[in-house]
Amino acid sequence: MAVPTELHGGSVKETAAEKESRVLEPGAAPFGNFPHYSRFHPPEQRLRLLPPELLRQLFPESPENGPILGLDVGCNSGDLSVALYKHFLSLPDGKTCSDASREFRLLCCDIDPVLVKRAEKECPFPDALTFITLDFMNQRTRKVLLSSFLSQFGRSVFDIGFCMSITMWIHLNHGDHGLWEFLARLSSLCRYLLVEPQPWKCYRAAARRLRKLGLHDFDHFHSLTIRGDMPNQIVQILTQDHGMELICCFGNTSWDRSLLLFRAKQTIETHPIPESLIEKGKEKNRLSFQKQ
């Protein structure tokens, strides 16, 4: 994906501005590792749909049993990770809380080391948010890094996982089986899972951007059989194949992506779903749960 500095048959060189323009072009981020993602999908659009008290509702026993442990997969430069952290702890802008890390600890991972480095540098809660470079599809590395984090708290799973606009990139780069495996691993690692799937139109747009830049197409795009209504497809895989249940649809962002909350069926039954989420979850009936 490197851009040549000199054209064949001539001595015309790209200017720094031209080179940066191509690097920052969305199509030049085939893993979704956009350098300024929050500029076109601001965190506030997600936060307005999520109740600030969500974690307190799901985990009323914390912090007596230790901090709530979260996993954010595909965290990019950490803007949304930090925003979610502040939102769920009701921390106003510009304010930190010395006790916050005892309530909620968040492990954030991304495939891009440059973005992870930026996230570490700019994070206002270094005691509570940990950023690591990780290709989540690398089984060996994933197991080592995630187990190392969980062992600090004597845990084997995370309380909640965040999968925000990452499913498409896994799907395009690893195919149908890769998406299935990705969701399998997440569901085995998290008691609850908040997923924001990209709709199929985003797949087509991502492929067009690559072609526009003259880059190699996604290896699996034309061979994908899991397609169409992607939120529904994600629901089918998680509920029918991976032992989770959809308990709430929080609605859609302004860019038409749904926020879906799942719960592992093996989660202790004495831990009831809050009534407010049950009522909110009736919105899920807007989704068609029939296989396509």
UniProtKB/Swiss-Prot annotation:
Keywords: Cytoplasm, Methyltransferase, S-adenosyl-L-methionine, Transferase. It is an enzyme of class 2 (transferase). Residues 53-274 form the Bin3-type SAM domain. GO terms for molecular function: RNA methyltransferase activity; small RNA 2'-O-methyltransferase activity; tRNA methyltransferase activity. Gene3D superfamilies: Vaccinia Virus protein VP39 (3.40.50.150). InterPro entries: Bin3-like, Bin3_C, BIN3_SAM-bd_dom, SAM-dependent_MTases_sf. GO terms for cellular component: cytoplasm. It is found in: Cytoplasm. PROSITE patterns: BIN3_SAM. Belongs to the methyltransferase superfamily. O-methyltransferase that specifically monomethylates 5'-monophosphate of cytoplasmic histidyl tRNA (tRNA(His)), acting as a capping enzyme by protecting tRNA(His) from cleavage by DICER1. Also able, with less efficiently, to methylate the 5' monophosphate of a subset of pre-miRNAs, acting as a negative regulator of miRNA processing. The 5' monophosphate of pre-miRNAs is recognized by DICER1 and is required for pre-miRNAs processing: methylation at this position reduces the processing of pre-miRNAs by DICER1. This is RNA 5'-monophosphate methyltransferase. The gene is BCDIN3D.
